[in-house]
Amino acid sequence: MENPPYHVSISKSEEIKYRQKCKDLKARIQEIQKGNQELLSKYEVIRRAVKRGRLERAILMEQLELQSEAKSREFGQRSEPSPPPPPEGIKIKISTKGAGNPSAKKLKISTEETSDTNVALNNTSEISHKSSNNSQPKDASVNDTDADFEQQNQVVQSKDEKITNTDPIPSPIITNLKTESSKSSGAKKATSNAKITDTMLFNHFSSIQKPKLKAEGSTLKGQALKKTLEDTWNNLTEEEKKPYHEGLLAAREKAREARRRRSAQNSAKLEKEKAKEKQKDKDQEQDTVSDKNQIDEIEKGQKEVDEEPVSEPTTSPILPPKNQEPIRMGGFTVVNRSSNA
């Protein structure tokens, strides 16, 4: 037959001490778990912030590059300061022909004010002539002054006629007078064409010709290769240089379009990341709520366990059953079956 289990008697103070130690260990475990959860949440927030910062930096760098190109084009087209305003009595009309090119703007002087000045000068000359005929000259100096005055009137009239009969005076470049047509696509193409220099065209030509020379088996390098390319470029005519000019424009437009597309992709990616982060925050909030509910349930069960009454240990000696002999060993009582049984 199997031996019965050992019966161990524990004092009340030891049992209370063990219970208190168990409570302390559970409280410590819960405190450590709570601290770990807080550290994990902080780490997740910092990781998302770093990722968002990197994306925003990439987008800002793209926008800065586009703005710098626009500013460089604007400053490249900025011309000399505008001339002083015309004198009073002269109206300036700006023709709308060739508004895309600032150098094609012309000033037209209206003849309204000049005709009025001619009429006034003619009237004054007639009055002075009549007065000179009616009145007898007293001195020779008076006649001389009248003659000088008439000559001045004739000179002024001849100048006015020349101004009205001549072609419109070409105006200098005026930066402040910009029409709506200058903001069209044609004006943008003109600005891009004006910005391209001979050095840029030569570099584009070199980038195209170098692979061709290498494929043909040329061994030129360094200054010799550069000299050959320069001689070839200088021997080309304007018509032969036109394809390289158009190719450079197409390449720059392609690069600009690629930058715009990259910027749009980065912005879309940032929006997706923000949406994912919002969804993750919601999920994390739900997890924290569920964890809190579980912790509350555990604490509630712990309180119920703590509130249960502790049974006091019996102080009466443990009597062995029949046919069993008690054996005392230290603080324990071991019951063995007798040999008679």
UniProtKB/Swiss-Prot annotation:
<keyword id="KW-0539">Nucleus</keyword>
<dbReference type="GO" id="GO:0006281">
    <property type="term" value="P:DNA repair"/>
</dbReference>
<feature type="modified residue" description="Phosphoserine">
    <location>
        <position position="316"/>
    </location>
</feature>
<feature type="compositionally biased region" description="Polar residues">
    <location>
        <begin position="165"/>
        <end position="177"/>
    </location>
</feature>
<feature type="modified residue" description="Phosphothreonine">
    <location>
        <position position="314"/>
    </location>
</feature>
<dbReference type="GO" id="GO:0031011">
    <property type="term" value="C:Ino80 complex"/>
</dbReference>
<protein>
    <recommendedName>
        <fullName>HMG box-containing protein C10F6.08c</fullName>
    </recommendedName>
</protein>
<feature type="modified residue" description="Phosphothreonine">
    <location>
        <position position="315"/>
    </location>
</feature>
<dbReference type="GO" id="GO:0005634">
    <property type="term" value="C:nucleus"/>
</dbReference>
<feature type="compositionally biased region" description="Basic and acidic residues">
    <location>
        <begin position="68"/>
        <end position="77"/>
    </location>
</feature>
<dbReference type="GO" id="GO:0006338">
    <property type="term" value="P:chromatin remodeling"/>
</dbReference>
<dbReference type="Pfam" id="PF24245">
    <property type="entry name" value="INO80F"/>
</dbReference>
<keyword id="KW-0238">DNA-binding</keyword>
<feature type="compositionally biased region" description="Basic and acidic residues">
    <location>
        <begin position="269"/>
        <end position="304"/>
    </location>
</feature>
<dbReference type="InterPro" id="IPR009071">
    <property type="entry name" value="HMG_box_dom"/>
</dbReference>
<feature type="region of interest" description="Disordered">
    <location>
        <begin position="236"/>
        <end position="341"/>
    </location>
</feature>
<dbReference type="Pfam" id="PF00505">
    <property type="entry name" value="HMG_box"/>
</dbReference>
<feature type="DNA-binding region" description="HMG box">
    <location>
        <begin position="195"/>
        <end position="263"/>
    </location>
</feature>
<feature type="region of interest" description="Disordered">
    <location>
        <begin position="68"/>
        <end position="195"/>
    </location>
</feature>
<feature type="compositionally biased region" description="Polar residues">
    <location>
        <begin position="116"/>
        <end position="157"/>
    </location>
</feature>
<dbReference type="GO" id="GO:0045815">
    <property type="term" value="P:transcription initiation-coupled chromatin remodeling"/>
</dbReference>
<keyword id="KW-0597">Phosphoprotein</keyword>
<dbReference type="GO" id="GO:0045027">
    <property type="term" value="F:DNA end binding"/>
</dbReference>
<feature type="compositionally biased region" description="Low complexity">
    <location>
        <begin position="178"/>
        <end position="195"/>
    </location>
</feature>
<dbReference type="InterPro" id="IPR036910">
    <property type="entry name" value="HMG_box_dom_sf"/>
</dbReference>
<dbReference type="InterPro" id="IPR056513">
    <property type="entry name" value="INO80F"/>
</dbReference>
<feature type="compositionally biased region" description="Basic and acidic residues">
    <location>
        <begin position="238"/>
        <end position="256"/>
    </location>
</feature>
